Amino acid sequence: GRKVYPDFASLPEKIDLAVVIIPAEAIPGVLAEGAEAGLRNALIYASRFGEGGDDVGAERAAELRDICDRTGLRISGPNCMGAISLPERLLFYPTSRVRGLPLGSVGVVFQSGGTFQFWLEQGAARGLGYSYAVSSGNELDLDMADYINFLVDDDHTRVIACMAEGVSRPDALMAAVERAFEADKPVLMLKVGHSAAGQAAAQSHTGALATDHHVFTAMCRKFGVVPVDTLDALIEMSLAFSAGRLPHGDRVALVGYSGGAKGLFLDIAETDGVSMPDFTPETQAVLREHIDAGVPTSNPLDTGAGLARRFPEFAEVAKIVAQDPNIDMVSVQGQLPLAEGTAGDPDLFRQIRDSTDKPVVAHNRMSQNINDAGRAFQAAAGIPFLQRLPEVATTLKALAAYAERRRRGIPPFAADKVSLDPDAAVEDVLAGHGISGPKSAFASNAAGVGDKALGVGFPVAVKIVSPQAVHKTEVRGVALNLASPEDAVAAAQAMSDRLLAAEPGAVVEGFLIQQMVDGLEVIVGVRDDPQFGAVLALGIGGVMVEAMRDVAFRLLPVTDEDVGDMINELRAKAVLGAFRGAAPRDVDALVAAVVGLSNSWPALQDRISDIEINPMMVGAEGEGVVAADIRSLSRDQN
């Protein structure tokens, strides 16, 4: 038996860690006593510390925070499932199911306890090995940022896999993932809460503030964090990133012996935006010598059924493909054996890998059961065997995106070369960064609109200016293509009458008269997010953007390349080209304007919390862009 002590004071020496397995209501008193006796670390399994709006639990959590602040005690949890240290073979976990996990290079941080255990088991079954793994729970004290920082400094860890439900300290998290990026330790992040219901569930589970999914993804892109959508994908990506190779580009080759798989992957590649270029003529000529007559030498490559049973020849074909200068990553068809010695030679896969410095993975068309024989085969082959073609596409895209972010680095704000009065109008700040509006004038009443319109030049647009007409289209406060002074006056008077009829107390400050500008309507804006800072949004469609939700997001600052990526993410990006007889749009001018808005933010951020240009009119190539409507929200208004 083991000797039991009644309290901390009775212990013969100070302890490093207290694993707390007592009711929640007793924990603050016990840990206060322990801290006074020299306890410095505690792990708390219990819940009821404020999750889901529990007031009594919140008071209990506040008591624990006070103990931490007064004594320096560090707490993991509460509401967690413990931690595992594979290098030291230490297990602080309430069940024995995770015993025997293999040592490896993946560090794991999950806020969810039950999912944590399940994912560790499934990852190990797929051949993942772990350094450290922690279920962070409510993160009352230590949080995901702390654990990521620890893993960045740990020599055993090469990849960090995370599942986040909420964010306790956004600034600390950004600093931690930036350190990981600088150390070339990829952080793979599965974030719960894409939907409003998912955000509410995450908040009630951990008590942490659930952030907007688009903003969180923008944070990931800025700091090289790899966003992940499913638990399965987190395993596939952990395997691929653990292999340690990054591509020089995003071009993928698929080598297999199934025509059906070839067609399926082409569908997936088109949907997911996977680049699959043709092989060079030289490569195709060499391939023709190795594959069956009549089999196309195109990418994806179906070598024909004959090579399915002649794997040394199949491996030679894969090596040829891997040498093609048009290709950055190679996936070869392969299924793990269910029994030792039943199929294949793992050394042939290793030879394919060793023939190139490009990432090489194997792919299975569907998920399969993987046992000890399969794991041993994968280890001997030296490459990850990815399951299911959609995960293959997602994983290879993620490798390319991470490599591209490493090439670009994390952009700083450009030094502002524009000298402006700190109290300059928002429009003047934007103009200093190359963003200007159409010729315009202001009339304080409807009667004066006609003369002002003459000065601007017809046709004109007239817009009501009123605190009660922020979204002008919703109150019919915009009139377009007015061709005479009389039309302009009548339109102004009509929109004023409509607003006052709908809201008798409304204040009509006047009317903005603008020269009509042709072009494609785009929305671009910046919002100061309370968690992650300034967020840029770019979308196509003007007033339709809210209905279509076709918007890309980034954290500031952005570069020309970042804006190009944002444009490519838009579903309606085709309208910027030669679309249905229209001339191609001035994309270069649009990119320059969006970067200009990004660069203007440091001069504006102390005064305003939001700025929106909607619409920004994008002219034909060479015609530039015009900010047709600029709206900002001062920090006093927010």
Where are the regions that the model predicts?
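Catalytic-core regions of core metabolic enzymes
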Residues: 1-638
